[in-house]
A protein has these predicted regions:
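Extracytoplasmic thiol/disulfide redox context detector
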Residues: 2-91, 139, 143, 165-175, ...
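Cysteine-centric redox/oxidoreductase cores and disulfide-bonded domains
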Residues: 87-180, 185-189, 194-198, 205-208
């Protein structure tokens, strides 16, 4: 996305930040401090997507491919699909904080609109205020889902939510050696990068059969 390097989280910096946090307890929004899943938990194919809300390839997958996977596989009980955050920069971190502050019933709707409107809420016209302006834009999206300004500010400052998001990134790096987004884990196999619906069809059908 071309953000300044000071926004980027190296793995070591993320680990350092996470080490400073407190254990997750007394959760602000416990219902969404987890990997969010769609589909039958007993489905024969389990897909985990590690994604970044500021990643253009992740937006392409969400906007162009996911609906077909949902219609053809998730809704038919063939695939269980889990979304996990993988924050790449400070804007990402704030966007994920907001996403995990909304009501569980609104999670997937907000996830969808943040990808659909990605170029609207990532505000880059002032290079020295990208984080500030983008966070203010996110506040407006929170309002669409009933998140007041006070609740939004509380969300941005909540250490438990930050803890959870950074932990998810660390686990992705340590367990699956993830270094880019999107990365898909399909029945334990790692597939890095966006894929077409035809590629997903081939992999899923092979796993089912």
């Amino acid at each position: 996305m071309g953000f300044k390097s000071n926004f980027l989280f190296s793995t070591s910096f993320v680990v350092f930040l996470f080490a400073l946090m407190f254990p997750i307890n007394g959760l602000y929004a416990s219902s969404t401090l987890k990997g969010m899943q769609l589909g039958d938990s007993d489905a024969p194919v389990k897909i985990i997507e590690y994604r970044s809300l500021t990643c253009s390839h992740c937006a392409d997958f969400s906007n162009d491919t996911f609906a077909e996977i949902k219609e053809n596989y998730i809704d038919k009980g063939k695939v269980n699909f889990e979304l996990r955050p993988f924050a790449l920069n400070a804007i990402d971190l704030n966007a994920f904080k907001l996403l995990h502050c909304v009501d569980e019933n609104d999670f997937f709707a907000m996830d969808k609109i943040l990808f659909k409107d990605q170029k609207k809420w990532i505000v880059t016209n002032q290079s020295d205020k990208v984080l500030e302006n983008s966070t203010n834009a996110l506040k407006n999206y929170g309002a669409l889902f009933g998140v007041s300004e006070e609740a939004f500010n509380s969300c941005m400052e909540n250490e438990n939510i930050t803890d959870f998001i950074l932990e998810q990134r660390i686990e992705g790096v340590e367990e699956y050696d993830i270094s880019s987004t999107p990365t898909f884990i399909i029945n334990g196999e790692i597939y890095a990068g966006n894929m077409s619906i035809n590629e997903f069809d081939e992999i899923i059908e092979k796993e089912i059969n």
